């Protein structure tokens, strides 16, 4: 009976160690290239899905050093200012691409606004706001960097963001301590 409990505890400890390694490797992730819209790509949304790009952006986290890949056919993509975004006005773009496979480097924190070069496509929902957070942080939390807001929000609480950031940065540490705690607890249980 005692041997079976020891084996079970060892298996659990091994599984938790593997979990900790996976979580730690995810925390050390470097710059990424995001294909805008995933498999949908950069095209006019379906009639009942004009928020497809808002949903896509809110399901991703963008950092300085990441890039966006726009894949499209017979269209274009423009980076515009906030006014150009909300009015689907591409008359004075910051950057414009029309080669069908365009990559845009996210080189600063803050909001980036993208629209289709076709006014009709833009008003049908082919536009995107991306919020870029600071550089990918590996293990140390830089207290000099202000917390980022969540995607597409204009007024996130800095306290909520700071606590979420600190909770996320302590996750790998917690995962590493769990197997140690279980091992110690199992030896204490076995010795009685």
Swiss-Prot record:
The protein, known as: Early nodulin-like protein 7
Xref: SUPFAM superfamilies: Cupredoxins
Tissue: Mostly expressed in flowers, and, to a lower extent, in seeds, but barely in seedlings, stems, leaves and roots.
One GO MF term: electron transfer activity
Start and end residues of each Phytocyanin domain: 32-134
Signal peptide feature range: 1-27
Topology of the protein relative to the lipid bilayer: Lipid-anchor; GPI-anchor
Keyword Signal: yes
Gene transcribed to yield this protein: ENODL7
Glycosylation sites: 48, 89, 101
Family the entry assigns: Belongs to the early nodulin-like (ENODL) family.
Cell compartments where the protein resides: Cell membrane
Disulfide bridge map: 88-122
Lipidation residue positions, type GPI-anchor amidated serine: 166
Gene Ontology CC annotation, any one: side of membrane
PANTHER family, per database record: BLUE COPPER PROTEIN (PTHR33021), EARLY NODULIN-LIKE PROTEIN 7 (PTHR33021:SF234)
Role this protein plays: May act as a carbohydrate transporter.
Keywords in alphabetical order: Cell membrane, Disulfide bond, Glycoprotein, GPI-anchor, Lipoprotein, Membrane, Signal
Propeptide positions: 167-192
PROSITE patterns linked to this entry: PHYTOCYANIN
